[in-house]
Amino acid sequence: KDGVAMVFHDYDLKRLTGSHGAVAQKTSTELRATKLLGSSEGIPTLWDVLHTVNGAVPLLIEIKDQDGAMGENVGALEVAVAEDLIDYTGDVALMSFNPHSVFALSRLCPTIPRGLVTDPYKHSDWPTVPKETCAVLSKIPDYERTSSSFISHSVDDLKSRHVARLKSQGALILCWTVTSMEIEAEARKFADNITFEGYLAELPTYVANR
């Protein structure tokens, strides 16, 4: 609400905090005072996280679509994120489902790697996104326009011809969301990296060998 970038997964507070209300309708002070379920910690700002990590590990930051329709109403959050990253020296990359957001990031912080979060976009899975927009986004047409270097695609759709096209052109392929070692093993036959939850994935080689 006050132009500060917050680190939080959902649009609504209920699932992760037990509180009511939309994140976008709260000030950063209110959100930092809102305790996460099972924790004494409040919702952190992006600056809080950057200060804590301080380059110790790479960060992949997803910028959430703000209007629920993948529309062109972007700018404020992207500016806030770019400002927080001005003096950050650690490894970081940015991504979003909304190609307008990724395009804005290409202008605001052109030296930071960026990518598109992608999906087959069945309209039944995206009821707030217009059918026409779903049809367009399913083809991943904005990769070049946004000067992306990777996509993060639905793990259930990695055999998509659109994903194969980008991989053949040199794009790095990430995927979401992997929920078991069995799914991970299958995904890694094609994907360069994964987003996982609900189990402990093996440490990447570069971490294990430190």
Predicted regions and their residues:
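C-terminal active-site rim and adjoining tail of enzyme catalytic domains
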Residues: 117, 124-210
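A glycine-centered beta-loop-beta connector
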Residues: 1-5, 187
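Metal-dependent phosphodiesterase/phospholipase catalytic core, i.e.
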Residues: 4, 9-121, 144-149, 153-155
